[in-house]
Amino acid sequence: MRLYRLVIVLSFLLVSLNVNSQTNEDDINLLSIFSEYVKAKNYDAAYEPWMELRERNPKFNSAIFVYGERILKYKIENSLEEEKINYINDLAKLWNEKRINFPRKTPLGDILAKSAQLLYDYMSELNMTKSDVYDKFDNAFITDSE
């Protein structure tokens, strides 16, 4: 009976290790695919595999965030008004996710300042006032100076 339990436990462990390695291999493939598209400046093709990896395993590699910023900036510049607002919000969300997943590589003040600059650049599209944007910059300055 003990041997039977041991065999079941070991087989379960082997199956779970195989599943984890398969997932890791899929992540490596997706990273390779979208990074090659980004290097070739084919951001539209890079978007789908990048988003899949970002949602599934954001801690896998910091390139998700570095290349993701390039992809979203391209999408912002080359999209219609409604989509543009979604991509702007997604870029701000991406920076926050980078801060959460890679805190040593991402100082909070930098993220807040980048977000405030993004809001300033697209103030009219986001229906924001100068006062709203000023408050964001002020918050970034206060947070970074602490």
Give the positions of each predicted feature.
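Post-signal peptide N-terminal segment of secreted/secretory-pathway proteins
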Residues: 24-27, 32-146
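Bacterial Sec-dependent N-terminal signal peptides
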Residues: 1-25, 69
